[in-house]
Amino acid sequence: MSFEKLGEDGKARRGRLTFPRGVVETPAFMPVGTYGTVKGMLPRDIEEIGAHIILGNTFHLMLRPGTEVVKAHGDLHDFTQWQGPILTDSGGFQVFSLGEMRKITEQGVTFRSPVDGSKVELSPEIAIQVQRDLGSDIVMIFDECTPYPATEKQAKESMELSLRWAERSKRAHEGNPAALFGIVQGGMYESLRDQSLEGLEKIGFDGYAIGGLSVGEPKEDMIRILDHLPPKMPEDKPRYLMGVGRPEDIVEAVRRGVDMFDCVMPTRNARNGYLFTSAGIVKIRNAKNRHDTGPLDERCDCYTCKHFSKSYLHHLDKCGEMLGSQLNTIHNLRFYQNLMSGLRGAIEAGTLSDFVSEFYALRGETVPPLGDS
């Protein structure tokens, strides 16, 4: 993988990731295909909505179907028939989500499989090997996602453990041509974030991710870390904000210099009839949509908006028809890709401020201030 920075507007960056399997323009949003599928989407649908990279999950794919099944097809690309680049999360966040069901030691984590209750071990070496077996194009180190809230002492111990695991991840990755990304931890403490970043840079990675955000903290804390951290991250490497996915949060992170994003929000919300539009959220199951013959979003060029009315989408939702979830997902993911395309174009043209102003004005909101970092 190579990363080329093509332009800037303020702190925002316009870039390009080049892989043997394809090119990804940044800022980029990666649809999440946890089990090897972006729910409700065929691979050709993902291409048509404009995504060029997707995310898979090491934790879930390791448990089901297992790497031996995937490897029998070749790799995850062959198994899923998605031939573009794939980033795989190492499983650290999913282990964090298990709460009291898991035990963390210096070696790694042991837990009971949510699939069949069997005892499972996950360590830096295992996580990296699983991602090698999957044929990931971007491999994530195995880390501990610092919980919120955490005292400074707890956050420091967690961050230092993640740094030790980062070294082991780097060693385990040797000989794999795929990119390897480090993950900055440290909770809500700027000084710990700095220590984590410094330690990761000494080890050396192909890209750097910001982990441990969108884990329950107030939005002002997330913005405070985003004001502080991205400007300190390597200029010549991609910056990836993990699991943060509200459109406004993506806009604010891009303004602060972040390049890559993923979140289940557009797909999960689509299945629940919670749709993103240029004017804000549309809850399609609300009664007011029953007789609305207009499109979901007049500014959207997706298949759903070009062919179907809000009334029809409301009808599908009320009937529990699977087509409703599919059409909603196509729209939400296309909305996100259009947002990223708009951000890229604005950075190129030096008009990001105007783009951001219009983004908030259409929602009836004012532009939040940028920090001074």
From Swiss-Prot:
Residues 243-249, 267-271 are annotated as: RNA binding. Its cofactor is Zn(2+). It catalyses: 7-aminomethyl-7-carbaguanine + guanosine(34) in tRNA = 7-aminomethyl-7-carbaguanosine(34) in tRNA + guanine. It is an enzyme of class 2 (transferase). InterPro entries: ArchSynthase1/Queuine_TRR, TGT, TGT-like_sf, tRNA_ribo_trans-like. It comes from the Bacteria. GO terms for biological process: queuosine biosynthetic process; tRNA wobble guanine modification; tRNA-guanine transglycosylation. Pathway: tRNA modification; tRNA-queuosine biosynthesis. One of its GO terms (cellular component) is cytosol. Its EC number is 2.4.2.29. Belongs to the queuine tRNA-ribosyltransferase family. This is Queuine tRNA-ribosyltransferase. It comes from Marinobacter nauticus (strain ATCC 700491 / DSM 11845 / VT8).
